[in-house]
């Protein structure tokens, strides 16, 4: 069925665990109720998802590192009747729950990078459809082994990395060991692999010397890879892949062979995309799926290679009526040797209004970085201020919240 780090779980292990859940008191009347899962062991999460889905229950996934009190509050807000925290035997019953007449669903909170996290609900029937069309679009051989470095408490690691693999008869390897050398050894010892990771993990893996080793397939998602990291990985990878999606829709598109770090590929069969083809005038990516229209708030355009990402609508900076896309400015700074990381965001000026601000991890003087930008960008795109920092804060999936950076600027 699957492997967690180096521990293998068979079909009989799966069945024994499901039978154990049958006997637990909290699951005797599971149908129609919501359960929150904040668990450390991927095998616990996956087996409970299978079990509760079969019981026609809804499941709220919460990242394993969430403190218990916070996780309980999240479960209460989601109207769950209880939460399993840490281990599958640690169940906390929650009171004052209103009965919900809903189709059994998978529940998740959005990342909150652009504001307060929202509770997203997707029916299990929608998840089943996603798995079916995802496997069709992925067109992966059964003997290609998914190595899942993304958490299974998130739909990317759970649905795309794990459930889709089990459905097509593959045996995924889920990595929770925090040592990047451990993960790299697993990859190197698995000839036909497809690595599921986010840019932060790939950045760490890419920092180790590869020698003559060649990655088979790397799948990235969650945020665009920095341009320099993309080209570095592409040199040692047979197929650089990227999938694009959102909490409301799941996976929307897959790119099988990236030519640029912003390539999102073609839509899955169950999704249709409304978007323009002018690179200089990107539009919001609007997805039609299951008789509903999803406004992603992502900007992009389409070409013969498929979809291309340009940025978040919320992140676009309006400098005296001219639009600045943070990704373009970040890429320019990252092309300067010695700039390790860069994040560009909106600042406020009492007279000028919106301005471009940046934080960088670099030993180079910010004045020199600004001079570099002036040589390669129109003046209105050049950061008004560049701050040198030792760390750029990221959330658990490796995303940076420009909104929080902006709010920090406003309140100081």
Curated annotation (Swiss-Prot):
Belongs to the ATP-dependent AMP-binding enzyme family. GO terms for biological process: fatty acid metabolic process. InterPro entries: AMP-bd_C, AMP-bd_C_sf, AMP-binding_CS, AMP-dep_synth/lig_dom, ANL_N_sf. It comes from Bacillus anthracis. The lineage of its organism: Bacteria, Bacillati, Bacillota, Bacilli, Bacillales. Disruption phenotype: The deletion mutant cannot produce petrobactin on iron-depleted medium. In vitro analysis show that mutants grow to a very limited extent as vegetative cells in iron-depleted medium but are not able to outgrow from spores under the same culture conditions. Involved in the biosynthesis of petrobactin, a catecholate siderophore that functions in both iron acquisition and virulence. Catalyzes the adenylation of 3,4-dihydroxybenzoate (3,4-DHBA) to the corresponding AMP ester, followed by the transfer of the activated unit to the phosphopantetheine thiol of the aryl-carrier protein AsbD. It catalyses: holo-[aryl-carrier protein] + 3,4-dihydroxybenzoate + ATP = 3,4-dihydroxybenzoyl-[aryl-carrier protein] + AMP + diphosphate; 3,4-dihydroxybenzoate + ATP + H(+) = 3,4-dihydroxybenzoyl-5'-AMP + diphosphate; 3,4-dihydroxybenzoyl-5'-AMP + holo-[aryl-carrier protein] = 3,4-dihydroxybenzoyl-[aryl-carrier protein] + AMP + H(+). Keywords: ATP-binding, Ligase, Nucleotide-binding. It comes from the Bacteria. This is 3,4-dihydroxybenzoate--[aryl-carrier protein] ligase. Pfam families: AMP-binding, AMP-binding_C. Pathway: Siderophore biosynthesis; petrobactin biosynthesis.
């Amino acid at each position: 069925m699957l492997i967690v780090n180096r521990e293998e779980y068979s079909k009989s292990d799966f069945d024994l665990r499901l039978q154990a859940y049958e006997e637990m008191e909290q699951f005797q009347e599971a149908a129609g109720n919501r359960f929150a899962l904040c668990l450390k062991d991927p095998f616990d999460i996956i087996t409970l998802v299978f079990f509760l889905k079969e019981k026609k229950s809804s499941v709220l996934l919460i990242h394993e590192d969430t403190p218990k009190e916070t996780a309980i509050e999240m479960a209460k807000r989601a109207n769950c009747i209880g939460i399993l925290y840490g281990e599958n035997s640690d169940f906390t019953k929650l009171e004052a729950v209103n009965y919900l007449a809903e189709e059994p669903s998978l529940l998740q909170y959005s990342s909150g990078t652009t504001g307060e996290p929202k509770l997203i609900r997707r029916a299990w029937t929608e998840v089943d459809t996603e798995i079916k069309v995802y496997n069709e679009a992925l067109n992966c051989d059964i003997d290609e082994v998914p190595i899942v470095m993304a958490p299974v408490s998130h739909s990317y690691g759970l649905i795309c990395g794990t459930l889709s693999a089990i459905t097509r008869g593959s045996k995924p390897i889920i990595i929770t060991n925090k040592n990047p050398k451990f993960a790299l050894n697993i990859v190197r010892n698995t000839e036909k692999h497809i690595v599921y990771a986010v840019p932060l993990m790939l950045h760490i893996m890419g920092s180790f010397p590869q020698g003559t080793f060649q990655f088979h397939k790397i799948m990235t998602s969650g945020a665009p890879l920095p341009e320099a990291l993309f080209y570095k990985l592409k040199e040692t990878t047979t197929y650089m892949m990227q999938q694009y999606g959102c909490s409301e829709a799941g996976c929307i598109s897959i790119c099988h062979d990236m030519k640029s770090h912003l390539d999102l590929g073609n839509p899955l069969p169950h999704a249709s995309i409304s978007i323009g083809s002018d690179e200089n005038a990107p539009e919001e990516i609007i997805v039609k799926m299951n008789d509903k229209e999803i406004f992603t708030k992502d900007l992009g355009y389409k070409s013969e290679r498929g979809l291309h990402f340009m940025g978040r609508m919320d992140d676009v900076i309006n400098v005296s009526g001219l639009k600045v896309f943070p990704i373009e400015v970040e890429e320019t700074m990252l092309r300067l040797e010695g700039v390790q990381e860069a994040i560009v965001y909106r600042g406020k000026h009492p007279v000028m209004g919106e301005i471009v601000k940046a934080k960088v991890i670099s030993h180079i003087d910010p004045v020199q970085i600004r001079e570099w930008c002036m040589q390669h960008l129109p003046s209105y795109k050049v950061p008004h201020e560049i701050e040198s920092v030792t760390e750029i804060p990221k959330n658990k999936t490796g995303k940076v919240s420009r909104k929080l950076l902006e709010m920090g600027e406003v309140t100081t």
